[in-house]
Amino acid sequence: IVRAILKYLKTVPECFCWKEHGGMYGTAGIPDIICCYHGKFVAFEVKTETGRTTALQESVINKIQKCGGKAAVVRSVNDVKTVLEDMVV
Protein backbone atom coordinates (compact mmCIF):
# COMPACT_ATOMS: atom_id res chain seq x y z
CA ILE A 1 0.00 0.00 0.00
CA VAL A 2 2.82 2.40 0.91
CA ARG A 3 4.52 1.85 -2.45
CA ALA A 4 1.31 2.57 -4.38
CA ILE A 5 0.66 5.72 -2.35
CA LEU A 6 4.21 7.01 -2.90
CA LYS A 7 3.94 6.28 -6.63
CA TYR A 8 0.74 8.32 -6.76
CA LEU A 9 2.09 11.20 -4.64
CA LYS A 10 5.11 11.57 -6.94
CA THR A 11 2.68 12.45 -9.75
CA VAL A 12 0.88 15.16 -7.77
CA PRO A 13 1.97 18.72 -8.64
CA GLU A 14 3.36 20.79 -5.76
CA CYS A 15 3.84 17.69 -3.62
CA PHE A 16 7.16 16.58 -2.14
CA CYS A 17 7.06 13.40 -0.08
CA TRP A 18 9.16 10.64 1.41
CA LYS A 19 8.81 7.39 3.29
CA GLU A 20 9.74 7.66 6.95
CA HIS A 21 11.74 4.57 7.85
CA GLY A 22 11.21 2.90 11.18
CA GLY A 23 13.61 0.58 12.88
CA MET A 24 16.39 1.38 15.27
CA TYR A 25 17.32 4.64 13.54
CA GLY A 26 13.76 5.93 13.13
CA THR A 27 11.54 7.74 15.59
CA ALA A 28 8.71 5.65 17.02
CA GLY A 29 5.20 6.83 16.21
CA ILE A 30 6.11 9.01 13.22
CA PRO A 31 3.66 8.47 10.33
CA ASP A 32 4.79 6.35 7.37
CA ILE A 33 4.72 9.06 4.70
CA ILE A 34 5.60 12.74 5.18
CA CYS A 35 4.70 15.38 2.58
CA CYS A 36 4.82 19.04 1.82
CA TYR A 37 1.74 19.75 -0.28
CA HIS A 38 1.12 23.30 -1.52
CA GLY A 39 3.34 24.48 1.35
CA LYS A 40 1.42 22.54 4.01
CA PHE A 41 2.75 19.74 6.21
CA VAL A 42 0.93 16.44 5.64
CA ALA A 43 1.55 13.06 7.26
CA PHE A 44 -0.04 9.73 6.36
CA GLU A 45 -0.15 6.73 8.67
CA VAL A 46 -0.73 3.80 6.31
CA LYS A 47 -2.73 0.82 7.56
CA THR A 48 -4.25 -2.28 6.01
CA GLU A 49 -8.03 -2.69 6.07
CA THR A 50 -7.81 -4.34 9.49
CA GLY A 51 -4.74 -2.49 10.79
CA ARG A 52 -5.07 -0.30 13.87
CA THR A 53 -3.01 2.63 15.10
CA THR A 54 -1.11 2.41 18.36
CA ALA A 55 -1.61 4.87 21.20
CA LEU A 56 1.74 6.46 20.28
CA GLN A 57 0.72 6.85 16.62
CA GLU A 58 -2.58 8.47 17.67
CA SER A 59 -0.68 10.82 19.97
CA VAL A 60 1.68 11.88 17.16
CA ILE A 61 -1.24 12.40 14.75
CA ASN A 62 -2.97 14.61 17.33
CA LYS A 63 0.21 16.64 17.92
CA ILE A 64 0.63 17.24 14.18
CA GLN A 65 -2.97 18.42 13.92
CA LYS A 66 -2.63 20.71 16.97
CA CYS A 67 0.41 22.31 15.32
CA GLY A 68 -1.62 23.12 12.20
CA GLY A 69 -0.45 20.22 10.06
CA LYS A 70 -2.63 17.61 8.43
CA ALA A 71 -2.29 13.99 9.56
CA ALA A 72 -4.51 11.10 8.59
CA VAL A 73 -4.77 7.34 8.75
CA VAL A 74 -5.16 6.04 5.19
CA ARG A 75 -5.78 2.58 3.79
CA SER A 76 -5.60 3.25 0.03
CA VAL A 77 -4.55 5.67 -2.67
CA ASN A 78 -8.16 6.86 -2.80
CA ASP A 79 -8.00 7.79 0.89
CA VAL A 80 -4.90 9.89 0.14
CA LYS A 81 -6.64 11.56 -2.80
CA THR A 82 -9.56 12.48 -0.55
CA VAL A 83 -7.27 14.03 2.07
CA LEU A 84 -5.43 16.11 -0.55
CA GLU A 85 -8.66 17.20 -2.27
CA ASP A 86 -10.04 18.39 1.07
CA MET A 87 -6.93 20.55 1.54
CA VAL A 88 -7.23 22.47 -1.73
CA VAL A 89 -9.35 25.59 -1.50
What are these regions (language model features)?
Residues 1-89:
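Catalytic phosphate/metal-binding cores of nucleic-acid and nucleotide-processing enzymes, i.e., regions
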